[in-house]
Amino acid sequence: MLSRSSTTTTTPSSVRSKVLAIAASAALLAGASVASSAVAAPAPATVPAAPVALAAPEVPGRGSTALNLFQWTWSSVAAECTSTIGPAGFAYVQVSPPQEHIQGTSWWTSYQPVSYRLESKLGTRAEFKNMVDTCRAAGVGIIADAVINHMTGADAGSGTGTGGSAFGVDYFPGLYDGSSFNDCRSNISNYGDRYQVQNCRLVSLQDLRTGSNAVRDRIAGYLNDLLSLGVAGFRMDASKHIPAADLEAIKSRLTNPNVFWVHEVIGSAGEPIQPSEYLGSGDSHEFQYARNLKGYMDGSIAGIRGITNGLLPSDRAGVFVDNHDTERDGHGTMNYQWGQKYLLGNVFMLAYPYGWPTVYSGYKFTDRDAGVPGSTATRVPDASCSNTAVWTCMQRKPEIKGMVKFRNAVTGTAVTNWWDDGSNHIAFGRGAKGYVTINNSASAVTRTYQTSLPAGEYTDLVSATGARYTVDSSGRFTATVPQYGALALAVGSSTPVDPGEPGTNRTTVFYRTSWSTTNIHYRVGSGAWTTAPGRAMTPACTGYVKLDLDLGSATTATAAFNNGSGTWDNNGSRDYTLTGAVARVDSGQVSATSPCP
């Protein structure tokens, strides 16, 4: 059996087998290396000269914010581009590897190629092309995850891929044979040894001889095929395991040698291979940013301005809160299971001017190797955001959609008017275009904020409730930010963001209260409950607060109310059933009349 060392220093998307080497992972997370077995090495590799800058491409009016739709089928991505991603203002969608791969239900089969045919469990070539065209029509470019370091594992033996292609241990008909792979046939055991990392097998995966012109031509042919279909850029999987010079040589063979690349290079202190040496052919994902972000969100965010210290230059760094590897493999990042703190991490990433951000959206899991529920060996079911038990659909969260709009509105501005309370409440402006405040504490906070915004009335982009705030002639406004909540104002934010998935049924909830802060904790139909304390309600008329609920195709919502500080009204443990166009809750009774003129 093979072991899997899932660590911050070693593991790209492709490293997946059935046994977890827990001890090795712990050692590497601490910065140590697994003991090396002797591997004969040629002369030491040279580090390339100073790289040529290739900044992340900006899409006019959309900036460079990307969305990673992990294990979404091409048909599902196409539909989502039209309904949500394009209207929300995303510039790009990163999709999972499109090439043919080994059969199996686990997600990591997508990272074990057997050919470069576009016939994967996520869809056919025709479906891929339709996705690219549909998303482009919605203003969204496709970034394809390119797996070019290796083919499937030597331990896989022979078999048939998802598109019907036969393959052997080191034979991939019409593509590669034994001469196409590096001479080192053992697994990497020492990440302090550059030769091993870039020439030996990554957990038995057949390591391509990328220094060979024949192999370079084959890889370039695959990428050029994707470019011919309209792909806008590539995430280069496992770049750390390919010499930077080889990648530059491959890119020079492309029909568009200036196409955008972002490298997966998981750097760690003391290792010989670092993200900076790959900047000659593209940007690099900055994994340390995500680790730093988790550290601040798990402790105090007052010092979060220092999150970029020692990291790549902003115009060369791709950033994320998590990705499909780190959410599973203990890389020290947050994931969807962090609830509101995870959303606040995304709010900060989208508000702060460092790097180009990617929002991650995948599916829920308890087994790190498990594929999407309902997957077969050759097909993944289409994504459905109405199935909240499976899909996370972060791109539909009001916090995410609102902050994508915020980021697009404040492009080109620096941080101004920084304020923090020395603990877990921060606020800062983006010049005269925007202002955001984040409360990473368990208590609601009311204060007056100093901004550089022009005087006027602004709609909060985060809460999606339509809450409006007046900035006076001195740039000040007063607001209550709920526990583990945020608020964002931007010039032009005169229309509230649509709260969640579009629907046909809508209920305006009025609640009578004397609380200074009121939240509604609810679920629509038989769906999932909101994360406590729920959504903040806004003043309606004397004695009442209100909130509009989008019920989608459902006709009822179940709810309880709270003040954000532990006091609840759950109707004597029975909760409230809300239905109709208006639901007025007063002293334990629900009626259908509005209390406000």
Question: How does the language model describe each region?
Answer:
Residues 1-44:
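Secretory targeting and sorting signals
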Residues 40-59:
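Low-complexity, acidic Ser/Thr/Pro-rich repeat tracts that form intrinsically disordered stalk/linker regions
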Residues 54-66, 80-86, 90-91, 97-119, ...:
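Active-site-proximal helices and loops of the catalytic beta/alpha 8
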Residues 61-64, 101-133, 166-209:
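Aromatic- and acidic-residue-enriched carbohydrate-binding clefts of CAZyme catalytic domains
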Residues 66-76, 205-216:
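Active-site mouth loops of central-metabolism enzymes
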Residues 465-466, 512-554, 563-578:
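Aromatic-rich carbohydrate-binding modules that target alpha-glucans
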Residues 505-509:
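Structural beta-strand segments of beta-rich domains
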Residues 576-597:
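Extracellular beta-sheet/turn segments enriched in Thr/Pro/Gly and aliphatic residues
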